[in-house]
């Protein structure tokens, strides 16, 4: 029992001690952790004082290397297993059992530990380097507080003396540094090897002998030839220097050849330069040539048109001078027109009008002429003819006053008024009569009454096709195309009364005196015929008779007469409507100029486009 009690007491005491030790250890560790958290420098110092197990392994490996070095010094013979690389040795050391690791004595272990501790003191940051991963930035591996340079690491002298690092990149058979030197020293030429070398050299000499002799002969011949040439040239140079004064002597043939070559080169260079200059001139002059071509073409066209117009004018002047005009007014007006010299500007205007209006120059001049008639057999002119009854005039005729005038045919079959495609080409508010009035000419419709169905002998006249630059004047239409229409028109106006003629004449004279009833856009001037005193007396009598008749008529009939009078041509003296004509002429002139400018711009663009297409 006593033994059991003592056993329990001992166990209890041991438990108490154990609990006390654990409590003290925990308290100490708690205090230490608090200190380490507050002061990290102290933690580093404590860590650096104790060697890590990796450091101990490294020290063991170093000691083994040292022992191997001592063994190599004692036994210089070659060890084939000595050339194993460092990682293989580390593997072998790691594979060794613990019993072999513990084979070291206690004194050696103490020495190793002391050296490790000294090394840890000298290198305070070595443990941090081993524990932390390696980074590219070397500044982060070394703290800023470190006063010593990393190159001032002091290794033990004994360790530096005895450390032998095996080469990593050589073969295992050459790991021993003494091997090659020993082989070189031990190698010696034997008499057998010397004999073989001599025989090899002799055979090589036999093979290369004849070739060398041939080469030597060729070299000797060349040397002799060059020596002879040098002697000849030296003599020539000496003689030439005496004459010329020290200049190099060259044969005459070489000089001639060099001169000819230089001349050929100069001529080639000059030819190339001239070709380049010509190409540049052609390139620069292409645009100028195009402009010149355009100008020449325009001038040629103008000259052709001018020649045609002048030739036709000459023919007309000759016809006027030879023939006698039945109408005195028309002859006087024609003489006045052709007595004035035509300037170039008016001719160009006539040409532009003939192009833009698509009217031949002959018909355009007929419109400008006053009273010339192409044929001698001309029927006498008739007076103004008015229908018997005013109701017979249809609304179509009233709305289109120029209907009969447009249907008249010229001597060549062209209408003298813009009743065809000409009016479509002209802008609004313009007519051929307005353009001719601007030019200072009188229209043929103003000098001849528009209602003359039998003006010419139509049996002798044939119409002509519309004007075009590519059409021949010989293309003519048959008579049956237009003769029935003319006969119908002639029959329509055969049944006119004398009273209606007198009434029409009187209305025309009244409208001359009172022009305000007429529309300004439809004013058409007809020259008043020169009347004698007898005519004036007759007119006065007619006026009185018509006034009495007008008083008897109702207001409706007077309105109808006024409408008819608007459609009839009116004789307006130049002295009465001079201011109105001035304003009308100015407006019409602006319209004509705008129209001509537009036509010129369009034609110029078309011409340039055609030229560009041709050049392409």
From Swiss-Prot:
Stretches the record annotates as Disordered: 68-104, 120-146, 255-290, 548-582
Modified positions (Phosphoserine) in chain numbering: 173, 267, 431, 531, 554-555
Molecular-function GO terms, alphabetical: chemoattractant activity; cytokine activity
PANTHER family: SECRETOGRANIN II, SECRETOGRANIN-2
Cellular component, GO, one term: secretory granule
Gene: SCG2
One GO BP: angiogenesis
Top-level taxon of origin: Eukaryota
Keywords: Calcium, Cleavage on pair of basic residues, Phosphoprotein, Secreted, Signal, Sulfation
Polar residues bias spans: 122-140
Family: Belongs to the chromogranin/secretogranin protein family.
Name of the protein in its database record: Secretogranin-2
Record organism: Sus scrofa
